[in-house]
From Swiss-Prot:
The active site is at residues 101, 104. Mg(2+) 2 binds at residues 268, 271, 307, 309. Gene3D superfamilies: Divalent-metal-dependent TIM barrel enzymes. It comes from Escherichia coli O139:H28 (strain E24377A / ETEC). The lineage of its organism: Bacteria, Pseudomonadati, Pseudomonadota, Gammaproteobacteria, Enterobacterales. GO terms for biological process: D-xylose metabolic process. This is Xylose isomerase. The gene is xylA. Its EC number is 5.3.1.5. Its main location: cytoplasm. InterPro entries: Xyl_isomerase-like_sf, Xylose_isom_bac, Xylose_isomerase. Keywords: Carbohydrate metabolism, Cytoplasm, Isomerase, Magnesium, Metal-binding, Xylose metabolism. Homotetramer. Its cofactor is Mg(2+). GO terms for cellular component: cytoplasm.
Length: 440
């Protein structure tokens, strides 16, 4: 079959002096960073949905892209053509992983039977493509939010029959992910929330969602899936308020239903923006709570209140994110999935490469800067100094539960405590970070 991207062989690393827009300037897969290949640190993935399913439509205009697999025709044949182009893209971009929703790769059909049969055929196609290309599946998931049946949610729907349909999709998508060797399975509650409390029973919906997640965990163990289950937090859109608002909210939910040891988090940069947090904050929070799993690498627009899903281009922002990830030991089953799309006006097919190349270079440079921060150790040293009092006898007795509130009050009076505030030196630390960012 003729190549779709016929003007490009493969994207290659050419170094920072290159002016070739279809070459990497910073991402060198084989470069060693802290003793590990860059490719192994970053674990890049391209997503199926924004890259090959979006047709350029928005709320104010119809599809703007001319994609051959989005033209009228037999649904399965078009899905197979889309898979051909997708794996050509993955290969030429040098990404080791990809991600999908069930209906990204397979026609939904008019019934559950058609859905299952179509998906089974496409899983065989994807398995062959993976074998041929060496590209692996980072994670799969089920789209339980686009079809009108999910207007009031999937797991939180007032109709148990909709709940059951969603369960069928998750079973099918998880088993497909397992068969394809996927390293994670993602759960994003696209419409698990509410528009108005006037028709919503919050307790009922929370119980439904909790039971659904428990069943997902049960099924994972039943089929022997060894990958990681991930929830992707998002505060709103498409609903007014979603139950998986941010990392801290999801932690509370998981604790309530006894799932905190079973499910981790897939953190998206743009969702952090919508929640009023920095990307850095959400990553650090997930790590602090022991829930860090994977990342959807993109960016939002602080001046817009919706998910713009742009490609990451801020080395400054992502250097601190990669610093947190490296400090925590790096990715295990997770990676950096580009949940990002070209702009509606970017209608040239090679714009897909420009977006991903820039994003991969951004994250590669961020990784190298983060590694310098780790090797230097100055930030860690400053934080250790700031909290050093907690290593004292008093600090340890407090943390180990050896002193009560009354004991502390007595101690403070007996020792005539008069603590003096110590500077946080924020400005100095910001200058230090800029040194890593901008000084060679």
């Amino acid at each position: 079959m003729q190549a779709y991207f016929d003007q490009l062989d493969r994207v290659r690393y050419e170094g920072s002096k290159s002016s070739n827009p279809l070459a990497f300037r910073h991402y060198n897969p084989d470069e060693l960073v802290l003793g590990k290949r860059m490719e192994e640190h970053l674990r890049f993935a391209a997503c199926y949905w924004h890259t090959f399913c979006w047709n350029g439509a928005d709320m104010f205009g119809v599809g703007a892209f001319n994609r051959p697999w989005q033209q009228p025709g037999e649904a399965l044949a078009l899905a197979k053509r889309k898979a051909d182009v997708a794996f050509e893209f993955f290969h030429k971009l040098h990404v080791p992983f990809y991600c999908f929703h069930d209906v990204d790769v397979s026609p939904e059909g008019a019934s559950l039977k058609e859905y299952i049969n179509n998906f089974a055929q496409m899983v065989d196609v994807l398995a062959a493509k993976q074998e041929e290309s060496g590209v692996k599946l980072l994670w799969g998931t089920a789209n339980c939010f686009t079809n009108p049946r999910y207007g009031a949610g999937a797991a939180t729907n007032p109709d148990p029959e909709v709940f059951s349909w969603a369960a069928t999709q998750v079973v099918t998508a998880m088993e497909a992910t397992h068969k394809l060797g996927g390293e994670n399975y993602v759960l994003w509650g696209g419409r698990e929330g509410y528009e108005t409390l006037l028709n919503t029973d919050l307790r009922q919906e929370r119980e439904q969602l909790g039971r659904f997640m428990q069943m997902v965990v049960e099924h994972k163990h039943k089929i022997g899936f060894q990958g990681t289950l991930l929830i992707e937090p998002k505060p709103q859109e498409p609903t007014k308020h979603q139950y998986d608002y941010d990392a801290a909210t999801v932690y509370g939910f998981l604790k309530q239903f006894g799932l905190e040891k079973e499910i981790k988090l897939n953190i998206e940069a743009n969702h952090a923006t919508l929640a009023g947090h920095s990307f850095h904050h959400e990553i650090a929070t997930a790590i602090a709570l022991g829930l860090f799993g994977s990342v959807d690498a993109n960016r939002g627009d602080a001046q817009l209140g919706w998910d713009t899903d742009q490609f990451p281009n801020s080395v400054e922002e992502n250097a601190l994110v990669m610093y947190e990830i490296l400090k925590a030991g790096g990715f295990t089953t997770g990676g950096l999935n580009f949940d990002a799309k070209v702009r509606r006006q970017s209608t040239d097919k090679y714009d897909l490469f420009y977006g991903h190349i820039g994003a991969m270079d951004t994250m590669a440079l961020a990784l190298k800067i983060a590694a310098r921060m780790i090797e230097d150790g100055e930030l860690d040293k400053r934080i250790a100094q700031r909290y050093s009092g907690w290593n004292s006898e008093l600090g340890q007795q407090i943390l180990k539960g050896q002193m009560s509130l009354a004991d502390l009050a007595k101690y403070a009076q007996e020792h005539n405590l008069s603590p003096v505030h110590q500077s946080g030196r924020q400005e100095q630390l910001e200058n230090l970070v800029n040194h890593y960012l901008f000084d060679k």
